[in-house]
Amino acid sequence: MRTPDEAKEFPRRFYDEVFTKRNVKYAEGSVADDVVEHNPLDPRMGNDKSAAIASLQAILDNTPDLQVEILDMIATGDKVAIRSRFSGSDSGKGWGAPMGVPATGKSFSVEGIDVVSIDSDGRFTDHYGLFDVPAMMQQLGLMPG
């Protein structure tokens, strides 16, 4: 069994590769084939590995200038909880695109929580992710405040 500090390295590297370096291919090797995405970005995508990868790609496509800051991490056993801040602008495909609204160009900054389970090979097997979507939509002018 890995130590809490060792367990924290998996999501830390994942965030760096995927969100900072915009390397979605890294996720393909870091997410188990049988992963369960418990809170998909769009429920119509499903909750499997392809949905997890598609969600990551959608986040990057919608926010080309995305910055993610890890604020806290707690690890125990095979689980790691990550509190983070996502900031950027709606300048890509547009967060309102599913509603027929083009990108607004406005900026947002919201916090989120991810809880992941990690297998013995260092791959994510479960992901629970929640971030403050209403606040983001309000900041982007896509929802009344």
Question: Which residue ranges define each predicted feature?
Answer:
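C-terminal and inter-domain tail/linker signature
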Residues: 1-145
